Amino acid sequence: RRTMMKPPVYLSRPAVTSALGNGLRTHIDALLMPSETSPLTFSDQWVKGKTFAFGAVNETLRPLPDNLSAAHRSRNNQLLWHALEQIEDDIRAAVRRYGAARTAVIMGTSTSGADENIPLFQHVADGGGWADKPFNQLQHEMASPSEFVAHVYGIHGLRYVVSTACTSGARALISAARLLRSG
């Protein structure tokens, strides 16, 4: 049986923002030379009466563009916007080289902008009405991050989000590689 080799697909420099910090070099340094202090935050915010450790980005984030609609205003998109500043020149170069219609946005996420609607859900759970607090369905959708990126960079090509919990990022890379190989 003859196996055909798939053409290679290369991953360029990633944009990275996490509890460890901002930028690839910061992450490499933190992983290779761990500090005495933990980047984890301890809180009972998520489970009442129990304290858990979790990672949180606590640095000041890049402000979202002033003209951005409410549908794109979420903490998730602001984290994304902050990270994308690291590779913004590469994104703009890809759009110039391949065109806005042939540039795709394939991403992985677990939350999209769902957190923005928690105040409404809590209000309703406490007996309030649905119309009493703001709700934006577009913030809540899984496609929210890819639609945001397409909007701010003027991308008109294929865009979607993979959401498989812990493997979302890896699955998004696999999907993107398949798209590149398909032409």
Feature locations, PLM:
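Conserved "HGTGT" condensation-loop signature of ketosynthase/thiolase-family condensing enzymes
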Residues: 2-158, 178-181
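Short loop-beta-helix segment that forms the pyridoxal 5′-phosphate
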Residues: 158-164
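Short conserved active-site loop signatures built around small residues
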Residues: 169
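Short, hydrophobic/aromatic alpha-helical segments in well-folded domains
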Residues: 172-176
